[in-house]
Amino acid sequence: MRVFNFSAGPAAMPEEVLRQAADEMLDWHGSGMSVMEMSHRGKEFMSIHEAALTDLRDLLGVPASHRILFLQGGGIAENAIVPMNLLGARKTADFVVTGSWSQKSFGEAKKFCAPHLAASGKTEAGFTRAPARAEWQLSDDPAYVHLCTNETIDGVETFEIPDLGDVPLVADVSSHILSRPMDVAKYGVLFGGAQKNIGMAGVTVVIVREDLLDRALSICPSAFEWKTIAANNSLYNTPPTYAIYIAGLVFQWLKRQGGLEAIEARNIEKSKLLYDTIDASSFYLNKVEPAARSRMNVPFFLADETRNEDFLAGAKARGLLQLKGHKSVGGMRASIYNAVPLEGVKALVEYMKDFEQRGA
């Protein structure tokens, strides 16, 4: 029996994609091989690779000024890879810290430069807001400005993206990429791990403006130097072939759904249903300011936290899994990525109401 999976990542996958991958597991398109067995330089995998790059460019509307790279290491590795590729001769980078992940990025940058905290969304209740551009106090000559546009742990999403002129904007988009249209031209760099909306863990997507490819520090390993990766079409070393294949299937699935405009409408409907249920209740609480609430990751807390384990056990009995909040903040978290159907959110909302009534 398939369950409704609310995991923050690795996360729910479109069932169509899983079934197609299962059908093609032993024999991809008459090749007699599994994708797992293919040479990454053979014509079979090259067709998969190129299709994935093309479909992602189409979905996001990536302009010709930007290159799409497939790397490894996840968003965590990019926290080091970004400064090694962008600092050049500059000594600082600016950070807008809106949650746990951008805070981690800020800390990692200290190994390479003197990062500057341009703004913070932290309040007495934790990370609950996304500072507006007017609040950003940028340094005089930063190499770039870093922003995590969706904080997976804290449930904070930044929707208003400013134009910073000549200063490159770097965004960690791991947990909301492909959930809505984006103006990629506004960014110098976008990066994201695949295990939320792109596909399975193992591949990291980096989208970088081509004129930024000449800034790498001399200490940057060749395998992580974007210029080298771009020059070799993301095939400098053996790529995570199966993860790229799965990502390509997800891109095709997204196109069949009507693209990102259609997906965004679904995500708005799903998140509104869940937030409305929380707000109408005196038993559940979400601490994030409404304007900054994530459509992908919805943390919530029970008024009586001694009942947390009962809540999780009851949810599991109904086939609602992976609802436990991150250990750093506690409570609950429902991650409702693209592949989580509206029916799953409706089932969760029904359970939440039933649980509240039983405890009243």
Swiss-Prot record:
Query: Which residues of the sequence carry a binding annotation for pyridoxal 5'-phosphate?
Result: 101, 152, 172, 195, 237-238
- What binding details are noted for the cofactor? Binds 1 pyridoxal phosphate per subunit.
**What is the uppermost EC class here?**
transferase
Write the record's keywords in alphabetical order, separated by commas: Amino-acid biosynthesis, Aminotransferase, Cytoplasm, Pyridoxal phosphate, Pyridoxine biosynthesis, Serine biosynthesis, Transferase
The record's annotation in Pfam families points to: Aminotran_5
Q: What is its main location?
A: cytoplasm
EC number annotated for this UniProt entry = 2.6.1.52
Q: Which amino acid positions bind L-glutamate, per UniProt?
A: 41
Q: Which GO terms describe its cellular component?
A: cytoplasm
**PANTHER family, per this entry?**
PHOSPHOSERINE AMINOTRANSFERASE
Q: Which HAMAP family is this protein grouped with?
A: SerC_aminotrans_5 (MF_00160)
| Biological function | Catalyzes the reversible conversion of 3-phosphohydroxypyruvate to phosphoserine and of 3-hydroxy-2-oxo-4-phosphonooxybutanoate to phosphohydroxythreonine.
Give the family, as the similarity comment puts it.
Belongs to the class-V pyridoxal-phosphate-dependent aminotransferase family. SerC subfamily.
The entry's protein name is Phosphoserine aminotransferase
Q: To which species is this protein native?
A: Burkholderia cenocepacia (strain HI2424)
The gene name reads serC
